């Protein structure tokens, strides 16, 4: 009789129990691991699977997380190069891809990452045909479109992390200037994640008080207080962090865990995330851009009809045209 048998009396033989709330993270670079630890700290999954092509790094990251099991509430952490390890995931988060270099525009990354997605997405679909896909790799709006096309999934199940982080950065920077916590600074950035994102100045408010009504020049070139600089800081922030530490990780990891929580707990919160916007705000092509979306366990169920000023809508359409110009040239 083994020590285990002496210690434990078995009363029911379990068949291999299937995870009910499994999350997979594809790519164990700085962003993937920041997503993983943020998800683990929020107790969102009963199983976390990690996938990557670099096997030593992958195993090392898995072991490092497993060694912290005592301090976590996720009973199973697994990893593998083979996508069989991802089977039956409810949510699959794609962070894999070529990393943005210092000074490199997100859109330059695109064809490099399309080729990587041609391998990843069919494997994810094979093992988790009913999952939600959350794309984080850049340029995120185009790669969300690519994931949608390759997966064959309905559009509500293919989500881009989009402007969830841009809006968080915006709220943080507004809060810094006002001396108020970002949770109480309500503001939205829509459109493309990154260089041509659109700040909705007309909707910025604190406790329902519209800042543009108090200060009509808000966000314009003629503003003596230069609030427009706040949006410029949002656009520049990733480039600044990359220049200083080589990559971004923590904020995007927290942002992704925020989205994962909304999905896994069916919270139906509204997030500025990338979805198919054809037919909205005058967009005519199959383009994914961030708009405020209701998110839950089945993915994106609804889109909030934002009231945008004509110049805000023009910027959104211009973003869509830029993205479509690149998308139509893609080889996949």
Curated annotation (Swiss-Prot):
NAD(+) binds at residues 29-57, 99, 138. The active site is at residue 193. Substrate binds at residues 106, 138, 169, 248. It catalyses: (S)-lactate + NAD(+) = pyruvate + NADH + H(+). Pathway: Fermentation; pyruvate fermentation to lactate; (S)-lactate from pyruvate: step 1/1. GO terms for biological process: lactate metabolic process. Its EC number is 1.1.1.27. PROSITE patterns: L_LDH. GO terms for molecular function: L-lactate dehydrogenase activity. InterPro entries: L-lactate/malate_DH, L-lactate_DH, L-lactate_DH_AS, Lactate/malate_DH_C, Lactate/malate_DH_N, Lactate_DH/Glyco_Ohase_4_C, NAD(P)-bd_dom_sf. Belongs to the LDH/MDH superfamily. LDH family. Homotetramer. HAMAP family: Lactate_dehydrog (MF_00488). Interconverts simultaneously and stereospecifically pyruvate and lactate with concomitant interconversion of NADH and NAD(+). This is L-lactate dehydrogenase A chain. It comes from Python regius (Ball python).
């Amino acid at each position: 009789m083994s020590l285990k048998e002496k210690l434990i009396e078995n009363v029911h033989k379990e068949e291999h129990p299937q995870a009910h709330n499994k999350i997979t993270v594809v790519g164990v670079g700085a962003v993937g691991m920041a997503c993983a630890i943020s998800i683990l700290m929020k107790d969102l999954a009963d199983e976390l699977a990690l996938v990557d092509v670099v096997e030593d790094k992958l195993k090392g990251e898995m072991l490092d997380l497993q060694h912290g099991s005592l301090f976590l509430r996720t009973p199973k952490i697994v990893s593998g190069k083979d996508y069989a390890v991802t089977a039956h995931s409810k949510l699959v988060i794609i962070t894999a891809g070529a990393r943005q270099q210092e000074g490199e525009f997100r859109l330059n990354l695109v064809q490099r990452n399309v080729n990587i997605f041609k391998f990843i997405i069919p494997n994810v679909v094979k093992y988790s045909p009913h999952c939600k896909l959350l794309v984080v790799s850049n340029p995120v709006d185009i790669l969300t479109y690519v994931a949608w096309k390759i997966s064959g999934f309905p559009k509500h199940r293919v989500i881009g992390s989009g402007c969830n982080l841009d809006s968080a950065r915006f709220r943080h920077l507004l809060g810094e200037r006002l001396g108020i916590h970002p949770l109480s600074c309500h503001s939205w950035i829509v459109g493309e994640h990154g260089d041509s994102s659109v700040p909705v100045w007309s909707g910025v408010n604190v406790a329902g008080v519209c800042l543009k009504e108090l200060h009509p020049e808000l966000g314009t070139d003629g503003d003596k207080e230069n609030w427009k600089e706040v949006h410029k800081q949002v656009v520049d922030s990733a480039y600044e962090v990359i220049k200083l530490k080589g990559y971004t990780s923590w904020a995007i990891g927290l942002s992704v865990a925020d989205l994962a929580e909304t999905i896994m707990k069916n919270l139906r919160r509204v997030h500025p995330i990338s979805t198919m916007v054809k037919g909205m705000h005058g967009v005519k092509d199959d383009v994914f851009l961030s708009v405020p979306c209701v998110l839950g366990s089945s993915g994106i169920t609804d889109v909030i009809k934002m009231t945008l000023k004509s110049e805000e809508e023009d910027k959104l359409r211009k973003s869509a045209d830029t993205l479509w110009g690149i998308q139509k040239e893609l080889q996949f």
